[in-house]
Amino acid sequence: MNSNVENLPPHIIRLVYKEVTTLTADPPDGIKVFPNEEDLTDLQVTIEGPEGTPYAGGLFRMKLLLGKDFPASPPKGYFLTKIFHPNVGPNGEICVNVLKRDWTAELGIRHVLLTIKCLLIHPNPESALNEEAGRLLLENYEEYAARARLLTEIHGGACSTSSGRAEATQDLASGASASSADPMIPGVLGGAEGPMAKKHAGERDKKLAAKKKLDKKRALRRL
C-alpha cells in the first residue's frame, strides 16, 4: 500500500507525529505503538487481550492506516493476528462506530486504540462482520468463548511468556509482516469468566429456576 504522507498537509503531519511520539513514549495500558519510520500513516500496534475475556493472555497485532483525508476521514483498522470476534472480518478489518459514523476530526489515535481494546471486552453482535461469531455470541456463549480462546492460544500465544512477548514486539519493531490467515478451527467445550459470560450465565440461571418451578407445580398436581 502506498504511503499517504505526501498527500497530508504539513500541519497534519506534525500533529500525527506529535501524537504518535506521545503514544510511543506513554501508551495506554496493554497497548504498544510501533511507528513506521518510512511511513507515518501506517501504524503497527499490539494489544494485550483483556483479563476476564476469551482473549486474555493473547497478544494481538493490528495496524491503523491513515488515509489522505485524515483527520476529516477516520483511519482504517485491521487485526493482523487471526482472531475470532464478531466485529473483525475475514481480512482482519475492524468494524466499530468510532471508525465510521461516530468519527470526528477531534478524536485522536489514542481514542481509536482504546475503543478497539474495549471491543475485545464488549463485542457488538449487531454489527457483525463475522456472522458466525456474532450468532454464537448471542445463542451459545460457551461455544463462542471456546472458539475465541482456541484461536487466541494458537495465533496470539506470544503473550504467554515474557520471551514470547519480547519476540513478538521485536518482530513488529523490525517491520515483520502479518501472521498467516489459517482457517477457523472448530471449538471445544468450555466456559469463560467475564462480563458477557456472566450475562449469559444469569439468563441460563433464570431459565433453570423457571423450569424447576414448573416441574414442582406439575408434581404437586399429581399428589
Swiss-Prot record:
Keywords: Acetylation, ATP-binding, Cell cycle, Cell division, Nucleotide-binding, Phosphoprotein, Transferase, Ubl conjugation, Ubl conjugation pathway
Domain UBC core: 11-157
Protein origin, superkingdom: Eukaryota
Active-site feature positions: 95 (glycyl thioester intermediate)
Gene Ontology CC annotations of this record: anaphase-promoting complex
Region described as Disordered: spans on this chain: 170-223
Modification after translation: Autoubiquitinated by the APC/C complex during G1, leading to its degradation by the proteasome.
Keyword Phosphoprotein in annotation: yes
Catalytic activity: S-ubiquitinyl-[E1 ubiquitin-activating enzyme]-L-cysteine + [E2 ubiquitin-conjugating enzyme]-L-cysteine = [E1 ubiquitin-activating enzyme]-L-cysteine + S-ubiquitinyl-[E2 ubiquitin-conjugating enzyme]-L-cysteine
Modified residues (N-acetylmethionine): 1
GO BP terms, alphabetized: anaphase-promoting complex-dependent catabolic process; cell division; exit from mitosis; free ubiquitin chain polymerization; positive regulation of ubiquitin protein ligase activity; protein K11-linked ubiquitination; protein K27-linked ubiquitination; protein K29-linked ubiquitination
Pfam families: UQ_con
EC number per UniProt: 2.3.2.23
Listed pathway(s): Protein modification; protein ubiquitination
Subunit structure: Component of the APC/C complex, composed of at least 14 distinct subunits that assemble into a complex of at least 19 chains with a combined molecular mass of around 1.2 MDa. Within this complex, directly interacts with ANAPC2 and ANAPC4. Interacts with CDC20, FZR1/CDH1 and VHL.
Descriptive protein name: Ubiquitin-conjugating enzyme E2 S
Organism (species): Mus musculus
